[in-house]
Amino acid sequence: MFNENPIKRRPSTRIYVGNVPIGDGAPIAVQSMTNTRTTDVAATVAQIRALENVGADIVRVSVPTMDAAEAFRQIKQQVKVPLVADIHFDYRIALKVAEYGVDCLRINPGNIGNEERIRAVVDCARDKNIPIRIGVNGGSLEKDLMDKYKEPTPEALLESAMRHVDILDRLNFDQFKVSVKASDVFLAVESYRLLAKQIKQPLHLGITEAGGARAGAVKSAVGLGMLLAEGIGDTLRISLAADPVEEVKVGFDILKSLRIRSRGINFIACPSCSRQEFDVISTVNELERRLEDVTTAMDVSIIGCVVNGPGEALVSHLGLAGGHKKSGYYDDGIRQKERFDNDNLVDALEAKIRAKASLMANRIPVQEGDAD
C-alpha cells in the first residue's frame, strides 16, 4: 500500500505502566479516564470493564480523598487493565494507593508539598517500580508563570513541565512520562513540540477539555494527528464530554487513520448518492454496531455503486461494490463469483467479515526462506 509506514517515531526511553510498555518504539497506548465517583466502587468497576472491552490499554482514576483511596483498593482487585491514580496536593494519598498496587501515579511533584514529601513519594515509587506521569495543563499553570507570560503559552507550559522534570532529575528518578495539555490545538501542539526537544522520556498526548463527542473528536484528531504524524507521542487520551468508551474508540480511529496502530475493522464507506444500489449508511452503521467485538485489524470497503467500488475493494481485505439487486463481493481484491442480495447485505457481510477476521487472526506468518 502507498506510504505504508511513513512516520518515524521520536526516540524515547522505556517505562512500564503495569504490563504495558510505553516509549522506545512500543505501540502507542490508548488511555481513558473514569467519570464515575471513585467511591462508587460498583459503578467505577463497571465503567473500567467497559473500557477494557473496547481495548483501552490504561485507565486513569481520580483519587481525591483517602476514602477514594480505599475504594481504589477494591477497584484494583476487580479489573485487569493497568490503573493510573490521579492525585493532587495530598502526598499521603499517593503513598496509600502505592500500597494498593497502583500501576502509575499522575502527580505534579511541585504541588504535593515540601521536598521531604516529594522525596517520600518518589522513593516509594522507586521501591515499588511505579512510574509517574507529570501532567501540565494550560488551565492550571502556576501563578508566577501566569504573571510572567500573562496567558498560557507554549513557553509557559514547557517551563512548568521542566520544573517538575527537574525535581525528579534531582531525585535521580527517570521512570516518568510527561504531558503538556491545552484546550487550544495550536497551543498544545507547539507545547509538545518544544517539550519533545528537551527530554527523552515518553510523552502522553491529549487536547484537554476538547468538548463534546463530535467537536472534541475533531479537535483531538487535528491536534494529535499533527503530533503523531511528526512521530511525537507514546500514549494518548481523547478527552471528551461523553461516555469514556467513545474516547477509546476515537483514539484507535486516529491511530488507525495514520497507520500507526490498528484494532478492529476499518470501514471504508462512501457517503452515498443517487447512484447507490443499497442503503450504504444504514448498512455501515449496523455492521459497526454488530462487529464492535472484532479486534482483528482489517479493511472492509462498502461502496454503493460500481464507480468506485471495485477500486476500493482492490486494496481492502473484503469489499462490496453495489449492483442492481445484487452486489459484487471481493476478497483480498479478487472479485468472487458469489453476489449478495441487496436486501440481505448486513447478515451476509457480517458472516463473511467474521470468517475473514478469524482466518487472519489465526494465520501463521511465513518465515523468510520457508519453502512453499
UniProtKB/Swiss-Prot annotation:
EC number: 1.17.7.3
Gene Ontology MF annotations: 4 iron, 4 sulfur cluster binding; 4-hydroxy-3-methylbut-2-en-1-yl diphosphate synthase activity (ferredoxin); 4-hydroxy-3-methylbut-2-enyl-diphosphate synthase activity (flavodoxin); iron ion binding
Annotated keywords: 4Fe-4S, Iron, Iron-sulfur, Isoprene biosynthesis, Metal-binding, Oxidoreductase
GO biological process: isopentenyl diphosphate biosynthetic process, methylerythritol 4-phosphate pathway; terpenoid biosynthetic process
Gene3D superfamilies: Dihydropteroate synthase-like, Sulfite Reductase Hemoprotein, domain 1
Tagged with keyword 4Fe-4S: yes
Pathway info: Isoprenoid biosynthesis; isopentenyl diphosphate biosynthesis via DXP pathway; isopentenyl diphosphate from 1-deoxy-D-xylulose 5-phosphate: step 5/6
Enzyme class: oxidoreductase
Binding site for [4Fe-4S] cluster: 270, 273, 305, 312
Named cofactor requirement(s): [4Fe-4S] cluster
Note accompanying the cofactor annotation: Binds 1 [4Fe-4S] cluster.
Reaction(s) the record says it catalyses: (2E)-4-hydroxy-3-methylbut-2-enyl diphosphate + oxidized [flavodoxin] + H2O + 2 H(+) = 2-C-methyl-D-erythritol 2,4-cyclic diphosphate + reduced [flavodoxin]
Pfam families: GcpE
Known role: Converts 2C-methyl-D-erythritol 2,4-cyclodiphosphate (ME-2,4cPP) into 1-hydroxy-2-methyl-2-(E)-butenyl 4-diphosphate.
Protein family per UniProt: Belongs to the IspG family.
Protein name, per record: 4-hydroxy-3-methylbut-2-en-1-yl diphosphate synthase (flavodoxin)
Organism, as annotated: Shewanella amazonensis (strain ATCC BAA-1098 / SB2B)
